[in-house]
UniProtKB/Swiss-Prot annotation:
Cofactor(s) the record lists: Mo-molybdopterin
Pfam families for this protein: Oxidored_molyb
Ligand binding (Mo-molybdopterin): 88, 91-92, 146, 181, 233, 238, 249-251
Lineage of the species this protein comes from: Bacteria, Pseudomonadati, Pseudomonadota, Gammaproteobacteria, Enterobacterales
EC id: 1.8.5.-
Catalytic activity: L-methionyl-[protein] + a quinone + H2O = L-methionyl-(S)-S-oxide-[protein] + a quinol; L-methionyl-[protein] + a quinone + H2O = L-methionyl-(R)-S-oxide-[protein] + a quinol
UniProtKB keywords: Metal-binding, Molybdenum, Oxidoreductase, Periplasm, Signal
Identification of the protein by name: Protein-methionine-sulfoxide reductase catalytic subunit MsrP
Amino acid sequence: MKKIRPLTEADVTAESAFFMQRRQVLKALGISAAALSLPSTAQADLFSWFKGNDRPKAPAGKPLEFSQPAAWRSDLALTPEDKVTGYNNFYEFGLDKADPAANAGSLKTEPWTLKISGEVAKPFTLDYDDLTHRFPLEERIYRMRCVEAWSMVVPWIGFPLYKLLAQAQPTSHAKYVAFETLYAPDDMPGQKDRFIGGGLKYPYVEGLRLDEAMHPLTLMTVGVYGKALPPQNGAPIRLIVPWKYGFKGIKSVVSIKLTRERPPTTWNLSAPNEYGFYANVNPHVDHPRWSQATERFIGSGGILDVQRQPTLLFNGYANEVASLYRGLNLRENF
């Protein structure tokens, strides 16, 4: 694996980055123009929302013990934590960015069971304590690129997925890894009400090729900003694959199953012409409704401070992962 370039201060996104709904992003900078046509009170509400005022308080996660490997270490000060935990994409708790923080308090994360099964020699189950104690945790500052054409950089805490899979010992028949979110309609209102949950089929499911899952960059994430994940960010454990669009980062995972066949994935089932299985960040393959050539890099500033920048192939991780797709037509296999 090639040496990874250390991130600089210009790379690090403030925690205010977790905002902007999918339907809002479609209009890109048009949101600010629309805001100017609103009544003054509505303008004030919108700009306060963007700045992070009046956000619901997120439950405090417990501090975690973790290392900071040199490849990911940074001494940079991060923006206040409530800005990352206040705005999220987690449709199980609603479509608006503030909904998960407002509604995810109903999610019960203790006890928790994560089952590893399928084409493995040694299936096993992890409980809640195992998630933060079975494997050494490390903090990694990763770029994150949403399919909605906005981006950020976040310090996640977790362990490489390959360490978990190695303990399960995949068989020679294992070709893919299927992931599944908790199904708990009484705790996750979006699973019970299609209006709240955006009409998706639940539970949320995702998948990777086995070689993608075994790549050192692929992270099972249990914390952010030094503490355990809050419910709205995917507690107690979620997936982060930094060279793929954010919807591949399945949250609140209860099942990891190795399979012979390619597993179904939620957004691909919902709109296969818009959301592919691979979902690799690619500036040369547009979404049917908007360009992916550039992105809005979201930092700590307000709505007028958002900067547009070129999108990098594989989200800037091409040196590490491009070899996985040698010979694959990335336009057809988006």
